């Protein structure tokens, strides 16, 4: 049986259903303070701060080694999707908490984040997810998970006026459309911007 190419797509007249874009919750500055205060170990404080200030993926976080951290420049090299290397930056608070955590370590594992008990293995993605979920429940915070930190960092950066191309570079997105999903800013920010620039 012969096979031919279809000249016209049968799907061309079918319109995409418009789904309402939901503004997903982000972690507020107040939530971050509560999460920090709720931590009972230095590792978790350092982990939360690094996730919040860099916007890295949880898979990138657990792959980090001590040697990847440049404290003087407050930056680290991560390997994203498809093993693409990129540089990300962390704030002064993260630097202090990371230094305190590393000073407290008694193991020689090259991994940046390890389990709290012997044999001090490299922390796994599931370990980070479970820890954050437990912390969120303890503090009655709604659905605390690693990606929420990434979304919060991106939303914060966009809200404060960081150009979308720079946010794209920090997040390691190959397509700007992916980054644009974080640009669904809340209405109060739109109103404030209108007052600042238009009114």
Question: What residue spans do the PLM features occupy?
Answer:
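Conserved catalytic core of the tyrosine transesterase superfamily
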Residues: 1-199
């Amino acid at each position: 049986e012969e096979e031919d190419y279809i000249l016209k797509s049968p799907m061309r007249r079918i319109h995409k259903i418009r789904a309402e874009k939901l503004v997903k919750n982000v972690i507020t500055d107040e939530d971050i303070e509560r999460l920090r205060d709720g931590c009972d170990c230095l590792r978790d404080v350092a982990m939360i701060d690094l996730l919040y200030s860099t916007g890295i993926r949880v898979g990138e976080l657990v792959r980090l080694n001590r040697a990847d951290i440049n404290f003087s420049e407050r930056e680290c090299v991560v390997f994203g999707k498809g093993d693409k290397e990129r540089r990300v930056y962390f704030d002064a608070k993260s630097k202090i908490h990371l230094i305190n955590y590393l000073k407290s370590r008694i193991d020689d594992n090259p991994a940046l984040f390890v389990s709290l008990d012997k044999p001090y293995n490299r922390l796994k993605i599931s370990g980070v997810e479970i820890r954050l979920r437990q912390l969120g429940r303890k503090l009655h915070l709604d659905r605390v998970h690693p990606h929420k930190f990434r979304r919060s960092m991106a939303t914060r950066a966009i809200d404060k006026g960081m150009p979308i191309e720079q946010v794209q570079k920090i997040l390691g997105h190959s397509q700007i459309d992916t980054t644009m999903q974080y640009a669904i800013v809340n209405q109060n920010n739109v109103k404030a911007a209108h007052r600042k620039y238009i009114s």
